[in-house]
Amino acid sequence: MAADDIVGCYQVDKARRSLTNVESYPKVGEQLHGFTVQEKKHVPELHLTAVRLKHDKTDADYLHVAREDKNNVFGVGFKTNPPDATGVPHILEHTTLCGSEKYPVRDPFFKMLPRSLSNFMNAFTSADHTTYPFATTNQQDFQNLLSVYLDATLHPLLKEEDFRQEGWRLGPEDPRASDALDGKPEDVLFKGVVYNEMKGQISDANYLYYIKYRESIFPALNNSGGDPQYITDLTHKQLVEFSKRNYHPSNAKFLTYGDMPLSTHLKQIGDVLDGFGKGEADTSVKLPIDLSRGPSNVTVPGPIDTFADADKQYKTSTSWYLGDTSEVVETFSAGILSSLLLDGYGSPMYRALIESGLGSSFTPNTGLDTSGRVPVLSVGLTGVSEEDAPKVKEAIQKVYQDSLSAGFSDEKVQGFLHQLELALRHKTANFGIGVMEKTISSWFNGVDPMKELAWNDVINEFKRRYQQGGYLESLMQKYLMNDRCLTFTMVGTPTFHQELDQQEMVRKEKKLSQLVEQHGSMEKAISSLREQELQLLKTQEEAQHADLGCLPSLRVEDISREKERKPVRESKVDDVDVVWREAPTNGLTYFQALNAFEDLPDDLRLLMPLFNDSVMRLGTANKTMEQWEDLIKLKTGGVSSSAFHTSSPTELGKFNEGLQFSGFALDKNIPDMLEILTTLITETDFTSPYAPAMIQELLRLTTNGALDSVAASGHRFALNAAAAGLSRSFWVQEQQSGLAQLQATANLLRDAETSPERLAELIEKLRLIQSFAISKSSSLRVRMVCEPSSAHQNEVVLQKWLAGLPQIRSPTSVDARSMQQVSSKAFYDMPYKVYYSGLAMQTVPFVHKSSAPLSVLSQLLTHNYLHPEIREKGGAYGAAASNGPVKGIFALTSYRDPNPLNTLKVFQNSGIFARDRSWSERELNEAKLGIFQGLDAPVSVDEEGSRYFMSGVTHEMDQRWREQLLDVTARDVNEVAQTFLVDGPRQSVCLLGEKKDWAEDWDVRKLSMNAGEAEAYPEDASTTA
């Protein structure tokens, strides 16, 4: 090695050492770029050094976390206690990102998405604060985004037209339509991105329960997201005043994380903050209601869950306070106490509340909430009958009493501490975002973030208290053995959605009558609204052609043409193919195995999710699930079994399906981990007298949350259902994890509850799956990620494990290569206030030359067509085009969309738009940058080698695709738009939402527990019983 190379290596190593060397930072009291150091601390167990500073001129708080991690993070948060339920913090979060003094373009936030290599960009409205974080590995990118974020939050333009677009407005559905000239009141509706987002949110019964619970226990803290009933009371003037009052450095907290220099950050941030004087900081901490005088009870109406029994429409929970979150050790201890009571099938709360049949699943607020100043422990149940609702609180209190009497086993506590040790060792790609999420909420509520980061200090103090005996029990006695609690109940009401619609109608009529008074007649009032809508459309369309030269951007030329190689090694162990990734893992080994099934019968495929749930629930002949859960926590970081589905990168429509098994542990515990995993898969006791009840309980858990799980990601469900009609591969995927799977599970539950014979048949099929689930065959493959020094020992362990596996192949079906007819125009009638859409078309395999241009096309359509047409003009929360290069699918989706018919028109015009547009070099470069955000994003060490192992995509394939992507031209984009979107093969579309008259020519289906109503995949349903 040359002398200058040695010097270079020494300097790099020295820089790394100094990065987390606490002495390399200014002393407490010293100043740097207008900031004064308040505190600094080295945290060796997290390999970081934290420095807390205060800006001299404004008193802005600043926390820097230095760590040898190239994925650097910035976040700025403001205390935003909501004054009412109009959603002003939420609407401000949206409009803040719509233009600023230095960057006066419309929507610089979304415009920066494709001008950056960030792997995380977002904004969050929390209960009492609003945060704007990003993460990137590129220093220039960091400085670009930091400049945009600082100007957006501290110098926003907050134009009234942006408020109307993002918040709420009243206007005709389509101001350009000829009938809009007639001025009919029924054609006028409420619009706005946030308004429609929150209408979508209250379609999610879990969200609605949680937010109404929060309003009851924290009435001093209004709904920050906004209630549609009150959003329409907010004015632009109120928004601007709220921003001036709250978005000030004196009311802010700044956080930076990673390996970039603190001094550089402070200079850039300080230059902006120096333009402000000292302002008012909102230091008020909102507290929950006073329960010192005894119990409180609140009951509110909610929607009916069509996937639950008609006589089990109650959701009820009870909440207790557990001290003060500034007591960091006690709050940590309360977290352990909560886990001991609630975590796992063997936990006392699960057994007393769900296994007993009192309800079907925990309420969404169940657990310990430490986001405010007062920690709150809530326990509750959904799917409860009116008669049983009062018994839930009694059952919870009995668990407290029994736990206090029996005490907590040391084995369970040690298992929890072992999980913490593994969490410290596990190298994640998004550690910095995790640091921000862990500290920011409590920081705004007066908790010192330095104490939150001092992991070992907290754990060691907990251990000291715990070793004295009876510590956790004393916390129970202190906080839970009393009746100072809130019981919150939501009752399913058949007219709930109709009442919301009626309330909206009344609000609309009131707004219109005010406009009639102002303009003299209804016709003139609606004409005025139409003119406003047309002006907004004009502004939106002008923005699509605006000069974006003021925005900073990275260059595609800065992206390396060479993909970073993370080499894998392949070997045969006992005739089984094994992929090895040897990397620094902090003494952990990660294991993954795939067992592929060829021509699997359809009825067994539909049962795979239930099988996976069962092996983690039923226990074995010699151990209960509680005992297994304790062992898993003591010996591993977790084990799992799940279905998999992967597509071939070289042949369209070719796929593999089967079961995958995974887990990780300390190197020394890998033999135990493999034995645990194998025993659970092969020896779960389906013949136990308790098995039938447990299986019904698992089916109820899934069906009870089905409507809410769809509402949370309806566009994905819509897309999967649409794609099911394109090929057998996508049809299989829909059976595994789509709406077909949800309906099949509901059918299974109905049959299990009404027919003991069908339940017995179901159990026999689960036993059949168990016989071939994990077996040593030519279809079994393994991946191991570990330290190079651990590979040999892991190979010895693996060989012994493989030798003990059974050798049974999965059954096949003669009909398995066929697929049932699936509609190419499906409409799922669901009780949501907004719509979700998915349009799918099959394209080419990953290695085809059109694959990379299709990905560029998807980015171009998202940012230049779908976002402005469907989100900005149409009011949907989101819209996107996406290319699945390995699956060979091109998709268009919308999310929380009030205007699905307009969206479908936009979708249908997408191909012609993309074909006829003369794409500029800037647009192409931005599209490529957007793709590289994902391609080059850091990955956690356990994911390394996974892409090759799962799908067979080699480094060489990825390298070729990368080069093709960098070389895509405008002509390439025009050509793939013509070939696939305009002239392409059959497209398939699916909508989810409330059925209207215009849906008559669609294939309308309904998901339901009721056999007479369920129309989704009826053929599949009959095969599952």
UniProtKB/Swiss-Prot annotation:
Its main location: mitochondrion. The keyword Protein biosynthesis does not apply. Binds 1 zinc ion per subunit. It comes from the Eukaryota. It is found in: Mitochondrion intermembrane space; Mitochondrion matrix. The keyword Protease applies. Degrades mitochondrial transit peptides after their cleavage in the intermembrane space or in the matrix, and presequence peptides; clearance of these peptides is required to keep the presequence processing machinery running. Preferentially cleaves the N-terminal side of paired basic amino acid residues. Also degrades other unstructured peptides. May function as an ATP-dependent peptidase as opposed to a metalloendopeptidase. This is Presequence protease, mitochondrial. It comes from Aspergillus oryzae (strain ATCC 42149 / RIB 40). The gene is cym1.
